[in-house]
Design a protein with these regions (language model features):
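Membrane-helix interface segments in multi-pass membrane proteins
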Residues: 38-68, 114-151, 188-206
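Hydrophobic alpha-helical segments of integral membrane proteins
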Residues: 1-18, 66, 79, 83, ...
């Protein structure tokens, strides 16, 4: 069984296979590959890496993606396990790590889009857009194509993770989705508080 392909047609069977036959190391490998794939577009249109060569941009992008995604991976597994148990679930952290990895499998297939964008736009892809209302250096068609694909894959990944959380905790996918939303709410509130504290500290110092 190839989880990278089967996830598209039989997501629940793929998740069950990962739980029964794979280790956390395998899940970590998936997360690393996914981070490298998504890292290509992480700094697109930001202007943060202007002046760097393409190899340096790739190295920084991949490094940043790994530094963010790997800790977030393990933290998400812990939080989904904890929140799920509060909602009546019976899952464990190991199985949660594997279904989260299963949920990001579709995102790996964004790699060809990232490579194509680099081939077409080169270093300009990572420059800040010029113009008051400019949002991207990509053509409108390519930008819309990329946005639609990313939106669709993100929704599909959320559906898979909802099913996976439900599978691990022995409850419905809807409750699994609720687990995701509760965690997202916690992250949002904590981020908002951190922003308020940071801004308040800066204003106080001024």
């Amino acid at each position: 069984m190839n989880p990278f392909l089967l996830i598209w047609t039989q997501p629940k069977k793929t998740l069950a296979y990962l739980i029964e036959h794979k280790t956390i190391g395998y899940g970590l490998m998936i997360m690393v590959i996914s981070s490298l794939c998504s890292g290509i577009m992480a700094f697109a249109d930001t202007g943060l890496l202007e002046g760097f060569s393409l190899p340096a941009i790739f190295a920084i992008s991949f490094g940043a993606a790994l530094l963010i995604s790997i800790p977030a991976y393990f933290m998400s597994a812990f939080m989904y396990t904890w929140i799920g148990k509060l909602l009546g679930g019976t899952g464990n952290w190991r199985e949660m790590c594997l279904v989260i990895a299963g949920g990001v499998l579709p995102m790996i297939w964004t790699l060809p889009i990232g490579i194509l964008a680099v081939i077409i736009y080169g270093k300009a892809l990572f420059s800040e857009p010029v113009g008051v209302f400019a949002v991207t250096n990509m053509s409108l068609g390519f930008y819309l194509f990329h946005t639609v694909i990313m939106t669709g894959l993100s929704i599909f990944s959320t559906v898979i993770q909802s099913k996976g959380i439900g599978l691990v905790h022995n409850f419905s996918a809807w409750r699994g989705f609720g687990t995701i939303m509760i965690y997202a709410g916690i992250v949002f509130v904590l981020s908002f508080i951190l922003i308020i504290i940071t801004v308040g500290s800066i204003l106080f110092m001024v």
